[in-house]
Amino acid sequence: MTKICIFGAGAIGGYMAHALIKAGADVSLIARGPHLEGLRDKGLTLIKEGSAETLPVKATDTPEELGPQDYVIS
């Protein structure tokens, strides 16, 4: 499985992470503060055309915890 790390869990990073998880990638997000806590507690939610879908996602503020990655998006 392809391992992908995305720095930033805002609108763009979150959208990309959601799409990549749905495609079967092993995605991790680097986030801070309230975003990090929300991802850890509730997962990643995408709301599109009135429909919401929540997926579990790995999230950390310490990239070293993730180990080697195939791709890093920053």
Residue ranges, per PLM feature:
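NAD(P)+-binding Rossmann beta1-loop-alpha1 motif at the extreme N-terminus of oxidoreductases
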Residues: M1-L44, K48
